[in-house]
Amino acid sequence: MTKTYIHGVGMTKFGNHSDRTLKSLLLDASRQALEAAGRPKIDAVFVGNFLAGSMSNQEILGAIVANDLGLGYIPTAKVEGACASGGIALRQGILGVMSGEYDTVLVAGVEKMKHANTPDVTQAINAAMDTDSNEKHAGLTFPGFFGVLAHRYFHETGATKEHLAMVALKNRENALNNPLAQFQKATSIEEIMNARLITEPLGLFDCSPMTDGAAAIVISRKPSSIHVRASALVSGPTQMQDAAELLSIPAIGESGRRAYEKAGLGPEDIDVIEIHDCFSMTEIIAIEELGFFKRLEGWKAVEAGHTKPGGKKPVNTSGGLLSRGHPIGATGLSQIYQLVHQLNGTAPNQVKGARIALAQNLGGTGSYSAVHILERL
């Protein structure tokens, strides 16, 4: 099959864009990526998005990009997979290039959430649950799900709320050096642990925020310095009670295994990682599922500093969802944006000698997981 390479990336600042429309954010990131790629002829557009219809009364995002950027009469599509929408959109673009159908594809992701009130956004996000499930009818929310996960993890290990705070603090410190991150104010373990409780044991800093923003990637069969070595997508249980065990998010582990197999690599080969840390607990589970640390020992790696920029396995050098921000449809592509800069040696919190990178993007409570492995040639 045809190989796929990354030619350009673009990203807006994440945060509150009350003065901008969803469309303007989407076009901004797309223009950046096209300029970085040298304005190539685009054969198709895929846009990752979850909430534009419900929150902004706007669909037809792919057609908007093609029309407003003058890309001509080309195939376009919006891709939805809850919080994994961006990662899934990228995979669709990659498959189009690998199949030979397209030479060059623009993949973009966007979300605008800050203009709406929290209850309305929460209600819209809950569409990423199985609405006929017992869990939904019982009133379980996403913070509630990951709070239950954290409680059980504490019970099975020596981990405490302080270890969650260590994840949140590490990601906030990383975001301080990222000019595009939503949060750039220093904090402390004490402030994190004493913050307003969202759902026991998760406090405010343990939960990803509502965010406006966009990111975009240009991929092509034409060689460049960044090779997409593997792309994997897996669907998993749509409710917690369907998983074989509570302390597992099977889709993460399976998507990781498939990506490693396709790449001919293992966790030991990865130099820098962007994880879908929608909650601090999720980062710990994900680094275990992806094989970077042993099962039920991710908290020890966090405590030892192994996931910091200078550690054994640097995780979320961008600040992650917790501090870079989480504009749902753009999140998976913002991970790629950071990792491309890491591999090019131009990233905030640069990991010395980074050559192989992994991005993991989660949807729902584990309904989707997309993993991409990138290599600097």
Question: What feature does the model see in each segment?
Answer:
Residues 249, 253, 258-280, 289, ...:
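Extended C-terminal subregions enriched in glycine
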Residues 1-23, 166, 197-258, 262, ...:
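Condensing-enzyme catalytic core mediating Claisen C-C bond formation in acyl metabolism
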Residues 2, 52-104, 112-117, 121-145, ...:
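Conserved catalytic cysteine-centered active-site region
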Residues 7, 33, 42-45, 86, ...:
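Buried hydrophobic positions in well-ordered alpha/beta secondary-structure cores of metabolic enzymes
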